[in-house]
Regions:
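Positively charged, low-complexity intrinsically disordered leader regions
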Residues: 1-31
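Alpha-helix C-terminal capping segments
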Residues: 40, 47-60, 81, 310-313
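Helix C-cap/helix->beta junction micro-motif
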Residues: 55-57, 174-176, 207
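Hydrophobic beta-strand scaffold residues
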Residues: 59, 86, 179-181, 212
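Conserved N-terminal subdomain of the carbohydrate kinase-like
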Residues: 59-152, 347-359
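Charged helix-capping and loop-helix junction motifs
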Residues: 134, 162-167, 193-202
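Conserved phosphate/ATP/ADP-binding segment of small-molecule kinases
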Residues: 189-280
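Conserved post-catalytic alpha-helical subdomain immediately downstream of the catalytic base
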Residues: 268, 283-353
Length: 359
């Protein structure tokens, strides 16, 4: 059972996002030890979209920029290099204590020392994302979009971005665009807004066609009971994850596809990585397999991106979860936060466990 997509669209995938910068100490060193660091463009939503954009599908990013900022220029150049169109207003900085693109300061960890992430989001310009700044009738009607991917990160950033995501979902529904929703719960974003965000997330989930989250996301965003978050022995918990998805399906029956990833951390550079997907009445399970991890950030985004690419290509559902699993595994071998596949074969080679040199 596939997902019937709208035809004759300018864009296969559209993502709303707040673009920012990640600062990563070199050689897996901790932030507090100082030294050299790498600065790179990042956002969870463009991490998802990168699988499709690198493999040749048309992608558009809806965002906002700080006017005249060299960081904004870096972001625009990066999106172009990833083969993505973008649209967004230019917001005046308002002086040195005004708006900026957020910083995520994150080390990769190494071996027995886990990675640490420090979000520095004061004055984040992405929190001003507002539906009034975008012509949704043009984007979804005249231009046409096959799938819009919404993230709970953007949905919870501010009251404006919450409304923006809600209006995007409503416009998508109006024009026949399929909706993908990755819940992406963050406790710090929800603090003080629990009642408001629960209602908004429930409405988006009720119209979503693809619904993705981990055990914590489903429990804390949608109130659906699931297994204990994280821990060891994930393979033995697969039936518990399935039961959670059954409860999600019962509460939010509009979706045809539900997915969750499975991750057990042996150490920072050695994970067991798996996935569960329900499409229609069929289950597709990738039992946790060993993967080597260079940097874990973006692995879950890679899974969603690979799954959406497979849906957009019209493949059978079994391949959706396989390609998603392998795209997530590919992302963890890169320092960029997002998968940059050379071609489909590179991802399928990871699925097949073939790391032999290609000449």
């Amino acid at each position: 059972m596939g997902i019937e997509l709208k035809k004759k669209c300018n864009y296969a995938l559209v993502v709303p996002t707040s673009m920012g910068i990640r600062i990563t100490p070199s050689n897996g060193q901790p932030v507090h030890c100082g030294g050299m660091a790498m600065m790179q463009v990042t956002s969870a939503e463009t991490n998802v979209a990168s699988v499709a954009s690198y493999l040749g599908l048309p992608v558009k990013v809806l965002t906002t920029f700080v006017k005249g900022s060299p960081i904004a220029q870096l972001i625009k150049d990066n999106l172009r290099s990833r083969h993505m169109d973008y649209e967004g207003v230019e917001v005046p900085q308002g002086g040195p204590w005004g708006y900026r693109h957020q910083f995520n300061i994150a080390d990769s960890g190494c071996g027995s020392r886990g990675p640490r992430v420090w979000n520095d989001r004061a004055g984040e310009v992405g929190r001003t994302l507002n539906v009034k700044d975008f012509d949704l009738d043009r984007i979804f009607g005249k231009e046409g979009v096959q799938i819009v991917h919404l993230s709970g990160l953007v949905g919870a950033l501010s009251p404006e971005t919450s409304k923006f995501c809600l209006e995007l979902a409503r416009a998508a529904k109006k024009y026949g665009t399929k909706i993908s929703f990755d819940l992406n719960y963050r406790a710090t974003f929800w603090k003080g807004r629990e009642k408001e965000l629960s209602a908004i997330f429930a409405e988006i989930a009720s119209v979503a066609d693809v619904l993705v989250g981990n055990e914590e996301d489903f429990q804390l965003c949608l109130g659906v009971k699931g297994p204990e978050a994280g821990g060891k022995g994930l393979k033995a918990k697969i039936e518990g994850f399935k039961e959670m998805i059954r409860r999600v399906k019962q509460a939010y029956p509009n979706a045809s596809t539900y997915g969750t990833t499975l991750r057990e951390v042996v150490d920072t550079n050695h994970h067991l990585w798996g996935a569960i997907m329900s499409a229609g009445n069929e289950w597709h399970v990738v039992e946790p397999r060993d993967i080597t991890v260079l940097d874990r950030i973006g692995g879950g985004d890679g899974f969603v991106g690979g799954m959406l690419y497979a849906i957009l290509k019209g493949w059978e559902p079994e391949k959706w979860v396989q390609f998603g699993w392998a795209s997530g595994a590919l992302a963890t071998t890169m320092m960029s936060d997002y998968a940059q596949p050379a071609d489909e074969d590179q991802i399928w080679s990871i699925w097949k466990g073939n790391a032999r040199v290609q000449r």
